[in-house]
Amino acid sequence: MNLNSIPAFDDNYIWVLNDEAGRCLIVDPGDAEPVLNAIAANNWQPEAIFLTHHHHDHVGGVKELVEKFPQIVVYGPQETQDKGTTQVVKDGETAFVLGHEFSVIATPGHTLGHICYFSKPYLFCGDTLFSGGCGRLFEGTASQMYQSLKKLSALPDDTLVCCAHEYTLSNMEFALSILPHDLSINDYYRKVKELRAKNQITQPVILKNERQINVFLRTEHIDLINVINEETLLQQPDERFAWLRSKKDRF
């Protein structure tokens, strides 16, 4: 299996997995044109589309892709049923694509119906988890997003986290504002800054490393608790997450 990223819009990534036979899986195609170009250039044969949620920058290219390749099966949560989904999937179910089983994980927060797909080592997490950050709470609650991130953080160490946006640099700038002396955060920030200066992608990321540098996955760590306690005493990790998310929204 080969993992490919296709840039779209200002900062989206459309992920494509292909096998040796050229069959491919497309994840969150917000725009059809760059996907069609990649299909033609690589002689891929699209077999399926995974949708994580209903936002237009993740589903906008579905109609055109299905018109061009009517054999495509489109998997997605209930909230994408009017966006071209032909196979609705929910938490705990599996999608069998390219000879692999992908587990469906419900991750409400960014939207209420958001889902992720996992087949070791690949995690397609849409707008739930970003490198160094997490998605905004457009529909769900902070508590829901906290629980969703806990689910993803519990996946195997070697999981390849495939995020849908290139937000890493700004996320790490925020992380530094919270934990300015953290060595892991400082090291990763320098690496990301160098990559982005060369217009290079910062993804996918390894989950084991992400747990060390993503403040939203560290709400139970004493260093972060101490920082938060300087402003307000919060007993529960989901409350600390809500505090962080609110800070990031204003950053």
Curated annotation (Swiss-Prot):
It catalyses: an S-(2-hydroxyacyl)glutathione + H2O = a 2-hydroxy carboxylate + glutathione + H(+). GO terms for molecular function: hydroxyacylglutathione hydrolase activity; metal ion binding. Its cofactor is Zn(2+). Signal peptide: none annotated. InterPro entries: Clx_II_MBL (IPR035680), Glyoxalase_II_hydrolase (IPR050110), HAGH_C (IPR032282), Hydroxyacylglutathione_Hdrlase (IPR017782), Metallo-B-lactamas (IPR001279), RibonucZ/Hydroxyglut_hydro (IPR036866). Pathway: Secondary metabolite metabolism; methylglyoxal degradation; (R)-lactate from methylglyoxal: step 2/2. It comes from the Bacteria. Keywords: Hydrolase, Metal-binding, Zinc. Binds 2 Zn(2+) ions per subunit. Zn(2+) 1 binds at residues 53, 55, 110, 127. The keyword Membrane does not apply. Zn(2+) 2 binds at residues 57-58, 127, 165. One of its GO terms (biological process) is methylglyoxal catabolic process to D-lactate via S-lactoyl-glutathione. Pfam families: HAGH_C (PF16123), Lactamase_B (PF00753). NCBIfam families: GSH_gloB, PRK10241.1. Monomer. Belongs to the metallo-beta-lactamase superfamily. Glyoxalase II family. HAMAP family: Glyoxalase_2. Thiolesterase that catalyzes the hydrolysis of S-D-lactoyl-glutathione to form glutathione and D-lactic acid. This is Hydroxyacylglutathione hydrolase. The lineage of its organism: Bacteria, Pseudomonadati, Pseudomonadota, Gammaproteobacteria, Enterobacterales.
